[in-house]
Regions:
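Non-heme di-metal
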Residues: 1-207
Length: 207
């Protein structure tokens, strides 16, 4: 699929909105998949958290669909990758791995890059799309926080060091790199200490 580009031209902004909409659509499926696949073995509050996440992601997708319509496009108008869903398939039998890879790596990456996208859209004069992306960014902090909280719950339940276990799972299940710069304030707000991910990024860069 085409790479996401900076939001300069109308075509680039449409492509970027489409790419984010695709991520949000996958995130809807992932939120409900984690409930259906793992909810029975977890406390009821786990299901409550991910139902709320799924509701948020559906609203995000709807908002992005409206913005795509406003720029004479629609979801499905462009090719899309399956990387996020591939991660779901790879972690389909391991809840800890699912939490480590999807919310704590992939969604946390959104916290790193979305503020720049907001600035790009504002700079291009598309304040409506910028506001949608800002809303998504602010609400995604809670989604990363839910993943981090439940990962730490599993670590405590299994008497494991959460930081070490997270790094082991990322090395095993994640095929990409943890790219700097990190949005450390947003990640910290989501309950992710720098010691979880920054040494891991350096290790992956060295491979």
């Amino acid at each position: 699929m085409p790479k996401r580009r900076k939001g300069g031209t109308d075509a680039n902004r449409r492509a970027l909105l489409h790419a984010v909409a695709h991520i949000e659509l996958n995130a809807i499926d992932l939120a409900f998949d984690i409930v259906a696949r793992f909810g029975a073995q977890m406390p009821r509050s786990f299901t409550d958290d991910w139902i709320q996440v799924g509701d948020d992601e559906a609203r995000h997708f709807t908002m992005l669909g409206s913005r795509l319509k406003a720029v004479d496009s629609f979801y499905g108008d462009l090719p899309a990758h399956d990387g996020l869903w591939q991660s779901a398939q790879d972690t389909s039998a391991d809840l800890a791995a699912r939490l480590a890879i999807v919310p704590m790596v992939l969604e946390a990456r959104g916290l790193d890059v979305t503020p720049r996208m907001v600035d790009q859209f504002r700079g291009a004069g598309d304040s409506a799309s910028a506001e949608v992306l800002q809303t998504i960014y602010e609400e995604e902090v809670a989604h990363v926080a839910a993943g981090t909280r439940w990962f730490k719950y599993l670590a405590k339940k299994q008497s494991r060091d959460a930081e070490v276990w997270f790094q082991e799972l990322v090395r095993e299940y994640f095929n990409g790199q943890l790219r700097k710069p990190f949005n450390k304030p947003a990640r910290s707000k989501a309950g992710m200490p720098v010691s979880f991910y920054e040494p891991l990024a350096e290790m992956l860069e060295g491979n």
